Amino acid sequence: MNWLVWALLLCSSAMAHVHRDPTLDHHWDLWKKTYGKQYKEKNEEVARRLIWEKNLKTVTLHNLEHSMGMHSYELGMNHLGDMTSEEVISLMSSLRVPSQWPRNVTYKSDPNQKLPDSMDWREKGCVTEVKYQGACGSCWAFSAVGALEAQVKLKTGKLVSLSAQNLVDCSTAKYGNKGCNGGFMTEAFQYIIDNNGIDSEASYPYKAMDGKCQYDVKNRAATCSRYIELPFGSEEALKEAVANKGPVSVGIDASHSSFFLYKTGVYYDPSCTQNVNHGVLVVGYGNLDGKDYWLVKNSWGLHFGDQGYIRMARNSGNHCGIANYPSYPEI
């Protein structure tokens, strides 16, 4: 457990006796049972209870405002409900945008092209099941393999889960990636290009921790010839790529509690910034109740959002920086 988590727990524990609400004891027990929560020490449970109560208040007030038409999305007390937004970002969102990144925008847009009003690559069988990255900042790896999985399906007709652990263990310092401490999708693609392949998830399973590189060419499940970067901040180019090419890897700002507690609807939080810190996969787009959205696959398990997915506001000023660093691989 890193210093930030300890600091949060200590502060919460010190105040817990003041704020605990005994009327919520039953609901706390139900929530723990639902998500299989167990705590090693009493102090940790007390601290988690305080954070949980704070999040519950946030969810309750937000959903009340939603019922009055003030928000386009609802929140819920999911498996992350006993964590702060700072913890979630520290443990599960470690996108590292290269500081000296020579962007090579090779995508050619066609402004006269008629695009479909909606797209969902899940319906075309190009998206694998939602994964759970755990307490490891490997979001970049899951975003990258998700984009490549779709390209493999489109070329071969076979949908195969690729190994995020292969990237965590092997696409490391040479590429500016740091395993569970973060990385970037284009650098993951570059590793696959240089390595001439990536193993399947079945042969190189995910462990949610850094390990020694164990790539085995005999278990290679995909290759990558190059990757394409889209123009910075262009939602139009992102829509075109998602419509014509397949799922696209992107970075977003996921640093707010409204994000990790999202349940359903079209996510729009005015406090969301252009500073991206989490890698995800855009697998489609559409419109819900008059709100344009991006359909985004996360790697926080099925309990997050809508079965692991979130609909994020589209055509709303590049909300959360979703169009800042889009890229996709080619086989």
From Swiss-Prot:
Its domain of life reads: Eukaryota
Propeptide ranges, please? 17-114
Q: Where located?
A: Lysosome; Secreted; Cytoplasmic vesicle, Phagosome
The terms describing its cellular component in GO are: extracellular space; lysosome; phagocytic vesicle
**What sort of enzyme, by top EC class, is this?**
hydrolase
> Which SMART domains does the record cross-reference, listed alphabetically?
Inhibitor_I29, Pept_C1
Renumbered to this chain, the signal peptide range is 1-16
Q: Which GO terms describe its molecular function?
A: cysteine-type endopeptidase activity
Q: What EC number(s) are associated with this protein in UniProt?
A: 3.4.22.27
Please name the InterPro entries in this protein's record.
Papain-like_cys_pep_sf (IPR038765), Pept_asp_AS (IPR025661), Pept_cys_AS (IPR000169), Pept_his_AS (IPR025660), Peptidase_C1A (IPR013128), Peptidase_C1A_C (IPR000668), Peptidase_C1A_papain-like (IPR039417), Prot_inhib_I29 (IPR013201)
- Function, in words: Thiol protease. Key protease responsible for the removal of the invariant chain from MHC class II molecules and MHC class II antigen presentation. The bond-specificity of this proteinase is in part similar to the specificities of cathepsin L.
- Protein name according to UniProt: Cathepsin S
- Species assigned in the record: Bos taurus (Bovine)
